[in-house]
Amino acid sequence: MAFLTKKKKFKFQTSFNLEELTAVPFVNGVLFCKVRLLDGGDFVSQSSREEVQENCVRWKKKFNFVCKMSANSATGVLDPCVCRVSVRKELKGGKTYSKLGFADLNLAEFAGSGSAARCCLLEGYDTRNTRQDNSILKVNIGMSLLSGDPCFKTPLSTVKTVSPPGQDSSLQMTCKGEGTVRSAGGTVRQNRSRQAMLSSGVFDETEQNLSSPEETPHSGHSRNSSQASQQSKISGHSSEHSRCSSMSDLTHRRNTSTSSSVSGGLSLTAEGTEPERDVKPEKPPRPIRPPLHPDRHSRRKKDSVESQPTWVDDTRIDADDIVEKIMQSQDFSDVSNNEDSHLRLFVSRDGSTTLSGIQLANRISAGVFEPVMIEIR
């Protein structure tokens, strides 16, 4: 039975891409990383030294190395193979450095998955005396099998999913859209895919329309606003209820199409939906459009789309109307050919000259200026 305790050996060609470090708590500085295999090899390498720009450092450095792994022969699960990425900052012009933090990555989780990206928070070396930063390191890891049994299992992922505050912990990635879940006590609970929409009040109206189990005449009836109308699998479902549900969908356009599914041979009659119709608020009336200009349609194209009045055309000022108003406000009937209305040249006795029209000529006293006539030859 010694062969059962012997572990399987594997070799993987690893492509480790060091992408970037975001949310760096420094405005300037030079950072670099040291990549080292803690298990399955002796690979050690450093990245290039890059400056901090807009609280972000981008290395775009690729490391290629071979790592060795082992797996239990009974279960086939790969043993951990940790690769540590240490982020460091240059000090004294590059002579020394300080360690900002590190991130440990289990390469066994990436075995056989092709290329996968991972973002992880930096862990501090001295968490007692230094404050931990929220810098996020992004890497891209790809692994391919070189030797060993191709049948193996990867360990469970250590990635932790953090849900926003106030979000229901029962919501998982498999829950899609909206739905109603019946608990053991018989109460109906509605799932929401996004808790943020509830806080903003988007679904306030739909929550009011959902009736509680005490208000509904039959406890086996539940409504789902995200699905289409379903046909009952029970032979006792009447056609009158289907006509009633379709009429309620047409009259209330703000709500999505509803459906009803009956369990246990119970059916919902038309009288049960009447109180729900009274609770729903009516759609507010649309504001009245301003009257159109009588000459507006003559200037438009006669296409089928542009011939219909739109809100943009009603609120837009027509340039032709402004030109017509300006032309009508001007008086072009008084056309005078009198020479006194033009500019006149006056020369005084001391040789000074002045230009003026008829208004200044009337105010000038006689003898001070003499008019000069210039003839065209």
Swiss-Prot record:
InterPro entries reported for this sequence: EEIG1/2-like (IPR039931), NT-C2 (IPR019448)
Region annotation Disordered: where it falls in the sequence: 160-313
Composition bias, Polar residues: 160-173, 188-198, 222-234
Residue ranges of every copy of the C2 NT-type domain listed in the record: 2-145
Ranges of compositional bias, category Basic and acidic residues: 274-285
Main location class: nucleus
Pfam families given in the database record: NT-C2 (PF10358)
Compartment(s) of residence: Nucleus; Cytoplasm
Keywords: Cytoplasm, Nucleus
Biased composition (Low complexity): 256-269
GO CC annotation, single: cytoplasm
Family: Belongs to the EEIG family.
Role description: May be involved in osteoclast differentiation.
Protein name: Early estrogen-induced gene 1 protein
